[in-house]
Amino acid sequence: TVPGVEEGVVERFLNGRAKGKNIEGFTDIKAFVDSIAIPRKIMMMVRAGSPVDELMDQLFPLLSPGDILIDGGNSNYEDTNRRVQLAESKGFLFVGSGVSGGEEGALNGASIMPGGSEKAWPEVKPILQSIAAKAPDGTPCCQWVGPAGSGHFVKMIHNGIEYGDMQLIAEAYWVMKKLLDLTNEEMADVFARWNEGKLRSYLIEITANILRHKDKSGGYLIDKILDAAGQKGTGKWSVINAMELGMPLGLIATAVFERSLSSQKDLRHLASKQFQCQHTQPIYNKAELVKNIFSALYASKLVSYAQGFAVLQRASDAFGWHLDLASIARMWRGGCIIRSIFL
């Protein structure tokens, strides 16, 4: 429990969003476990790392043989490999499931990528598919990925591709702003127009919205956001694992490094004084250059996804996972951050 933050969270939820719904809340873990029909299906959504192991240690003595634990956090796939073996050695089943969608996904359906103990799939399939997002053709964005930590490996690569997409959008924004001198509204119009064609995606859509958003003072919020990006680790893991598998992941690696560079604000500020960005000649045909930026962004996106899926294939071969790459692409068509017509 986080002091001052999580006390009373169950009560607030029951009196808020859950009010009038068939939802029970518990503050005692034993009472919670005892309330669930056997075989129990318990989904853990906690911070990756030791908190998952600590929660599992609390749950193990309370479970019955055949019960299923689902880790829906951003766990490292190697941790999931270990947890699958540990749970199965105790007579339980373990599912390591990538989940993408953020707060909106929690409310309206996420992209869910389960892997681990395959015997658990028939039990958890109706539950996970019922809360998953639906693709445009109505297919649930949730299918079985494979054994061991494959589900979390797929989510890791998803996040790496997400890093790449965001970096490409940031660079397109920078060129339009610094080289073409487009206003926020003009750039918003460009991104909105792109979102009507083959670049239509969640990230392009929200970029247009962000560029138009104004704060309470009436100024554009984008101009007041610190240009320093953090990261939680999955992008870095993608690059490390690609290197260990001997696969190129250059675009995503650069996106990870750019995030690291962005956090060095003082150094960048000093460098910006020494190396001024100046126009050498006026830009006459801005519309033509915007078309070129579109083409460059689309081509770069192709490279990013091709590299990401190549890493998935190499991991599948190396670990004997037998991943269905087409099924994975279909799972990413809705709910997740990289959902797009591209997929």
How would you label these PLM feature ranges?
Residues 222-304:
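A conserved active-site cap/scaffold subdomain adjacent to cofactor or substrate pockets
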Residues 186-191, 252-257, 324-329:
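Beta-strand segments within the central parallel beta-sheet cores of soluble alpha/beta enzyme folds
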Residues 1-8:
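Glycine-rich phosphate/diphosphate-binding loop of Rossmann-like nucleotide-binding domains
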Residues 193, 316-343:
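Small-residue-rich helix-loop
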Residues 52-56, 76-189, 197-224, 258-288:
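Rossmann-fold dinucleotide-binding core
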Residues 176-188, 242-247, 318-321:
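Inter-helical turn/loop segments and adjacent helix faces that build the functional surface
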Residues 5, 14-92, 102-118:
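Rossmann-like NAD(P)-binding element
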